[in-house]
């Protein structure tokens, strides 16, 4: 069972932490962005490749001391299909290192995450000096915050 694997990882690392992977392009070191933009241009693909490279470095540094990662889907969806592929590749890489992967895909999240979903599905995203419209929806359905014990 899935949770049994997580418990095993927690026991092995003696650490109940989860590393959140909420990679805003602004957080990615310049040398990674420059390398990816040189190869793929200031494109959604270039941005997504930069996120993936950054994540790989984090995973390499953490996999033997932290049992799990939690990539936030919104920050990948901001870069369209290339970003969704980077999410998949991040998950695949974390699993290859033996980590437990929790996809954070809640659509009724905090402000910064909602801004990322809005940019991905309704707005525009800046990559270097270029601006892109990752997905072409005219509207996006979301769940409102649900408060109370029944919703925890």
Go through each PLM region and give its residues.
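N-terminal glycine-rich anion-binding loop in soluble enzyme alpha/beta folds
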Residues: 1-61
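Acidic (Asp/Glu)-rich catalytic clusters
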Residues: 59-66, 93-96, 151
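Short, well-ordered coil/turn segments that N-cap beta-strands
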Residues: 13-17, 64-67, 97-99, 135-138
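Glycine-rich, proline-tolerant flexible connector loops at the mouths of alpha/beta enzymes
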Residues: 47, 71-83
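Conserved small/polar residues in nucleotide/adenosyl-binding loops
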Residues: 19, 150-152
